[in-house]
Each structure stands twice: as structure tokens, then as C-alpha cells.
A protein has these predicted regions:
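Cleft-lining beta-strand/loop regions that shape enzyme active-site pockets
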Residues: 38-39, 43-159, 278-398
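Domain-scale detector for complete catalytic domains at protein termini or as standalone homologs
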Residues: 19-20, 322, 475
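Flexible, low-complexity junctional segments that flank or bridge functional domains
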Residues: 2-44, 82-87, 112-119, 124, ...
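Intrinsic disorder and flexible/low-complexity segments
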Residues: 282-285, 289-322, 505-551
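Short glycine/threonine-rich loop-to-helix capping motif typified by GTGT followed
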Residues: 337-342, 471-474, 517
Length: 551
């Protein structure tokens, strides 16, 4: 074991040395590469294709994140709208991967683009997601091949429940929750879905389904509810799509005007080549992204914790004429304690804080958001989930099956709390629930103060209930429906700023931090990931809802 440890240490040291030696070379090569930038001279057509988009990324000395950031996307589209030389935008549906929120956030800009530019969408397979992107265009075409089709379905939700399989191993995972709809972790403790969870998920799924139906009605003047539910639009060919008025015809890439040898560039090439306008304003609004689960660990690339939030907030001290801060939150929640520590740190800031919610701003994410003077959500943001949950596993039956005899001694009570080899007594369980109620009370106090709502009215919309942004606006959990740009503009307007510039605060990692985070990547089964989640969050009081991450 010692030899293996020494060998591993030697390998890591070697990697660090190699990286340090090669970094200057990478830097030089990067400088040469930058000289080959695409020229926009004579360019009239931009192909909008985007396979990867991130809300936030880490700046390190040895790596560059090649994915386009959310704000870079918005900036580039705004510039494109003002670029009189660009006459046509072609949306390549097969090369687009955007979330619901990202689609919503670019709608307004595409409406501006369509005023003086031709926008055409083309693709082979249109599902509900990609078709919503296609609806940004003035004209929708299928690629002229018999392989092109529509693939519209209703909705379904499935997830595995592990109680019985864990029982065969002698493992029991207990979940305690404050709030009937705070159902995180029930897939470990139950053998089937609770009615509360089913009700909550059906509410979200049905609303999203109706949103899609209504959007198609608005844009294409056709109701396709019956066709979808009957399965008629599963692998529906171009003839069916034209008949229903869902597309305008068939075409090839060349016929719609894609010619990379003449006047066409991809969107990312346009982003790298267009000339940025210099902003000489003295007024600054800072943007900080908080993305990922809220936890103390750094095992995942996207984690929100007190330390990395403090690092970002410390950078605000170096910004001259800082007028306000926009927090962009994209999180399903996590540690209750970490959420409170972040909340307290933000509370000390003497500038107005506005909140822009991404795909997710639920549980601990919403907890942090309550610090905001004004909260913006997208209509399809998942938010709320005001409640508390705790998971604690027991292995008493496991050691019995293995014929292991636990021997020891104690003086006093409470040693069964969070001892995985002891059954939890009712007395200890009551103490845990008392502590959870205290934490829940603190959560509600923040919401009551931030939203100016009575505790009685709050309970009607809390208890772990999850809401779409449009619903959260109706029940008072957010102030406005809008994009990141809308949030920024609102802050500037309320501050009465005639002009302003934006400064984006990024996390930073050293060479050693990047190398230490390097681990072999293996394909993980859903079960393994779930077990790792139990291990990570066991015995911690949580503001968390794991069901929302891949919803």
C-alpha cells in the first residue's frame, strides 16, 4: 500500500512539473493561433449552431474553457442585431443544445433580429426542445431527406426506487423532511412515489406541455394537442409536417444560403471575430454566477460554497464606482448551513443586489436569492422548494448479515444520532426534527422578510412545493419574469444610471488546484451516482431537491 501511494505521488509530481514546463509553450502557441482569426469582411450569413453553453466557468493558469458563456451569447446576439452587414441568420437545429431557460432568454433578441434580417431554421429531427428553437425563425425547413422527421410526444417521468434492493443488503436509508412536498431522498426510503411528489411533478410537466402547445398555436396557428397525444407526430415525415403547417418546406443547406467559401461563418467564429465596443462608463454593475449544488466539498466542477463565494465577493473591493450586483443563480440547493453562511456574507454588502434565476433556483438556491432586493425568474425556471430534508442511512442489518458484532461502551445519551451502526431512538429522532424545524423557521424568516408575506400565507406555497417561474411570480415568490439582461437593465434603471459597464467575476484556480482535481473518469450507473449522493449528504440538514437537476 505504501509503495502504491509513493508511486501515485511521484506520478502527480511529474504531471505538475510537465505542466509547469509546457505552460509557456502553450501560451506561445496560443498567441500564434490567435493570429488566424476569422475575418468578417464580406460575411452576410451567420449559422447559429451552439452545442455547449455554460452559466459559469473557472479561470485557471493552464486551461481555457472553450464553451461559450451565457452572457457572451447574449452580448454576441445583441451585436448581431445591430450589425447591418449581416443579412441572414440560419439556425442549424441539429447543432443546437440549449435549455428551456436559454431558449426563453434569447427570444427577445431574436425578435429584434427578425426586424431587418432573414432568419431560417433547418434540421432533420425536430423534438419539442429543438422545435422551440426553430420557432425563433421566420421560416422553418426540413433537410431534404426521407430521414427528416418530427418527434413530438406528451410527457413521462420515471425514476428508480431503491428501498427494496437496499434492504437485501441490510441497508435502511431514513429521510426526515419538514414540508409534505419536500420529497428529496424518498427514492431511497420508499418503494414507490409519494402522492405529493407525483402531484408536484405532474403540475410542472403539464404546465410545460401546455406552454409548448400554446407556443405552437401562437407561431404556427395550429393546435397539435390531439396529434401529439395520439402518437401521430412520432417520426412524422415532412409531408405530415407540411400538411399540419409545422414547417414551410424542404431544402438543402446550399439552397438556403450556407456557403462557407463565400459569405458564411459559424456563430462561434462570429463571436471570436466581431469587434467589441469599448465602454468608457465610470459606473459599474458586477455580475456573479453561482452555479451547482451548495456544499463544502470540491469534488464536482460546479459547486457553490462559502469559500468560493467569498473569493468572488472579495474581488468587488477592487472595482471602482461599483453601483450594484446581479447574482445569477442556477442551483438545486444543498447544505443548509452553507446557504446561511453565504446569505450572511451577502447581507454585509452595501450595494443593491438583484437576482437573476437560471434553469434552477430552488431550495438552498432560493434561500440565497432571498437576499436580493428584486428577484427575476424565467417563466420556465424551477424555483421554490422551501423546506428541509435530512438523509441518514443505517447499516444495523448489514452487520447482522455479515455476523459482525459491534462492541463498545458509552456514557450519556445521543450516540445513536448519525451512528450508521445503531438504530435511531424515538428520543433522538425528536431532537433531530426539533433542529430541522429551527432550520426551517430560519428559512421562512428570510422569505417572510424578503417577500413581505405572512407566515400563514407562506405555508400555503412552501412546504417543499416546487414552482415554475410563471407560477412563482403569481404567488409572490419572485418580482418579475425576465432574462439576465432584463434584470441588469432593471437594476440600472432603479439606480438611475444613464450609462454603465458590466464586470463579470469568475472563480480562479491555480495549477496545483487544477491538477489535484484531476481524477480518472469512469462511466457511472445511476445507482452508483445515487449511492455517492447518499454518502455526500448523509447526516446533513439540507435545503435540496435532487429531482430538479435533470428535470
Amino acid at each position: 500500500m505504501f509503495v502504491l501511494s509513493a508511486l501515485l505521488q511521484a506520478v502527480i509530481i511529474s504531471i505538475v512539473v510537465i505542466i509547469v514546463l509546457l505552460t509557456p509553450i502553450f501560451f506561445i502557441l496560443g498567441k500564434f493561433k490567435n493570429k488566424d482569426k476569422v475575418s468578417l469582411k464580406g460575411i452576410k450569413t451567420v449559422v447559429f449552431n451552439l452545442n455547449e453553453l455554460v452559466e459559469d466557468y473557472i479561470i485557471s493558469t493552464i486551461s481555457v474553457n472553450k464553451a461559450l458563456s451565457h452572457e457572451a451569447l447574449l452580448k454576441a446576439l445583441e451585436h448581431l442585431a445591430d450589425d447591418k452587414k449581416i443579412e441572414k441568420i440560419i439556425i442549424d437545429i441539429d447543432e443546437i443544445d440549449l435549455s428551456r431557460v436559454h431558449i426563453e432568454e434569447i427570444k427577445e433578441i431574436f425578435e429584434k433580429l427578425s426586424v431587418d434580417k432573414e432568419i431560417i431554421a433547418i434540421g432533420t429531427t425536430f423534438d419539442e426542445y429543438s422545435y422551440q428553437v426553430a420557432l425563433l425563425a421566420n421560416k422553418i425547413c426540413m433537410l431534404n431527406t426521407k430521414q427528416s422527421c418530427l418527434y413530438f410526444r406528451g410527457y413521462e417521468y420515471k425514476e428508480p426506487y431503491f428501498k427494496n434492493i437496499l434492504a437485501t443488503l441490510g441497508v435502511t436509508v431514513n429521510t426526515l423532511h419538514i414540508g409534505d412536498y419536500k420529497v428529496a431522498g424518498e427514492s431511497f426510503s420508499n418503494d414507490k412515489m409519494s402522492e405529493e411528489k407525483k402531484e408536484s411533478l405532474i403540475n410542472i410537466k403539464e404546465t410545460l406541455f401546455q406552454n409548448f402547445i400554446n407556443l405552437v398555436k401562437e407561431k404556427r396557428k395550429v393546435d397539435i394537442t390531439n396529434e401529439i397525444l395520439s402518437g401521430d407526430l412520432i417520426f412524422a415525415n415532412s409531408e405530415k409536417a407540411i400538411q399540419l403547417g409545422l414547417i414551410d418546406g424542404l431544402s438543402t443547406y446550399e439552397e438556403i444560403g450556407i456557403d462557407y467559401n463565400e459569405d458564411t461563418v459559424d456563430f462561434l467564429e462570429y463571436v471570436s471575430a466581431y469587434k467589441r465596443k469599448k465602454n468608457k462608463s465610470k459606473n459599474t454593475i458586477a455580475i456573479i454566477n453561482l452555479e451547482g449544488e451548495i456544499d463544502t466539498r470540491e469534488s464536482k466542477e460546479s459547486i457553490i460554497n462559502y469559500d468560493n463565494v467569498v473569493e468572488k465577493l472579495d474581488e468587488l473591493e477592487d472595482i471602482k464606482n461599483l453601483k450594484g450586483l446581479v447574482l445569477r443563480i442556477n442551483s438545486p440547493g444543498g447544505s443548509a448551513l452553507e446557504s446561511e453562511k453565504i446569505y450572511q456574507k451577502l447581507k454585509k454588502l452595501e450595494i443593491p443586489i438583484y437576482i437573476s434565476m437560471g434553469d434552477l433556483c430552488a431550495s438552498g438556491g432560493y434561500y440565497i436569492a432571498t437576499i436580493g432586493k428584486k428577484l427575476f425568474a424565467n417563466p420556465v425556471t424551477l424555483t421554490g422548494s422551501i423546506g428541509v430534508v435530512i438523509l441518514y442511512p443505517e447499516f444495523t442489518e448489514t452487520i447482522n448479515k455479515l455476523k459482525v458484532n459491534m462492541e463498545g461502551f458509552s456514557k450519556g445519551k445521543g450516540f445513536d444520532i448519525f451512528d450508521v451502526f445503531s438504530k435511531l431512538s424515538e428520543e433522538s429522532k425528536e431532537k433531530i426534527i426539533y433542529s430541522m424545524n429551527e432550520v426551517y423557521s430560519e428559512f421562512k424568516e428570510h422569505v417572510i422578510q424578503a417577500r413581505n408575506i405572512s407566515e400563514e400565507d407562506l405555508e400555503k406555497i412552501a412546504g417543499g412545493r416546487v414552482w415554475l417561474g410563471s407560477q412563482a411570480k403569481a404567488n409572490g415568490l419572485v418580482d418579475e419574469l425576465g432574462s439576465l439582461n432584463n434584470c441588469i437593465d432593471s437594476l440600472a434603471k432603479d439606480l438611475e444610471l444613464k450609462d454603465f459597464k458590466l464586470t463579470y467575476i469568475r472563480g480562479r484556480k491555480s495549477i496545483m488546484e487544477v491538477v489535484s482535481a484531476m481524477k480518472p473518469q469512469f462511466i457511472k450507473s445511476n445507482i452508483i451516482e445515487k449511492i455517492e449522493m447518499i454518502r455526500s449528504y448523509s447526516n446533513k440538514i439540507l435545503y435540496y431537491d435532487e429531482n430538479l437537476e435533470n428535470f
